[in-house]
Amino acid sequence: MRPYFTRERFGQPQSFAGLLLLAFLAQALWLVHAELRTAREPDSAEAMRIGEGWKQWNGRGVAAAPVLDATGIPQDPFRTDESGFDAEHSPLLYVVSAAPLLLWPKDLGGESATYWRWLPRVPFLACGVFLGASLWYVARRLCGNTGGFIALSFYCFSPSLIQASAVWHTEPEIVAAWGAFGTIFTAIAVAHTLYAPREVVLWNWRRIVLLGVSLAIAVGSQFSMIVLVPMALGFLLYVAPVRRQAGLVIWIAACVVGLALLFGVYFFHPHEFAESMRRAGFWGATWRAFTVLGVYKQVAVQIGRACPALAVALPVTLVTYATWPRTRYFGNSAPLLVAVLFFLLGMAHPHVAGGGFLLAAIPFLFIFVSGVLADLLETQYRPLVMACTGVVLVFSTASTLLALAQVPQG
């Protein structure tokens, strides 16, 4: 049997990518440490997630379906309807937050809060690392090693993604972002396999399961991510137009897998699942937001917070994409299209869901920018492009590290 850790599978590129991801994790851990160093009790949102998740793990009902006052945790009027059901999320985030606490051998008291309060953040830190690894894998396949490292460098020193992974004064939107990224690129990968003359379901069952898992993670973390279901179908049919019937079969199978996993998040309680689905806010868009100038400013701020380097790199790559036909191929166009769509959906959802769409757009934007830069690096201007890209990455990294150093304790 061929060994797994061969030079081809795990060489210098993988080692360097691992170091970048460790740097990302270290920055997120620093944020968690800065917050938990003095704060002995979780804030109201985190306390609600932990309390509701703990309730479900201990068989006292389903998390946020509905939120029960008897637990001692107040209802959040911004995230629950009048019946106490969370209209934005399934129990996934609650269950994931509380799951690591099942391993804590002592009481969850204030004396030991310095230690156990790290545990609810572990799943979200892991999601941040997994999203970074997924981004590097996709960017490397699309743009080569150089493009992959550019995208991963953007990601690993992105203030907004570091903050989201650490859940530092924000919602755990990193889970929905990871699910969205996995859904889109798994659908594209599955579509490419349809050109091989093999049985549709038998050969693709692993990718079907992976697509279903990605859908369950995304929709379970944010109900409005249901838009990924038709988006996945669109990519399946577009990439493999000669085998659209096979693509439709795979899409249906993946949706069934995703629905089963989402039902499992409710611990297979049919009544709570049905009531939660009935009250879920799958579509809360309002087009009035597009008439408000402040919404556009907020999107611009989000892009700047995502990566300071985008202030220079994004305009350059957009102009290049518009004026140079060579860059307008599927590998660049698809992530740009998804990023733009997510930005529009973020603007149309001014409440909790909007932040999830805006964050989910950022990894796709990194793929697009790195892809266009990789194309520019193949021209006669490679030395100039390489120098400018290096300067931009150094500036972005330095500004992020400086901002982290100035984070107040507590």
Segments and roles (model prediction):
Residues 4, 191-195, 227-257, 323-327, ...:
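Perimembrane helix-loop-helix junctions
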Residues 18, 110-111, 135-158, 178, ...:
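Transmembrane-helix signature of polytopic, membrane-embedded enzymes
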Residues 23-24, 151-156, 185, 215, ...:
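Short helix- or helix-capping micro-motifs
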Residues 114, 118-142, 182-186, 316-322:
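Transmembrane-helix motifs of polytopic, lipid-linked glycan transferases
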Residues 140, 183-207, 218, 373-376:
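Membrane-interface transmembrane helices that cradle and orient dolichyl/undecaprenyl
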Residues 166-175, 354-355:
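Short acidic/glycine- and proline-prone juxtamembrane loop motifs at membrane-interface regions
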Residues 237, 305-329, 340-343:
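Hydrophobic, aromatic-rich transmembrane alpha-helices
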Residues 238, 248-292, 395-407:
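Membrane-lumen/periplasm interface segments of specific transmembrane helices
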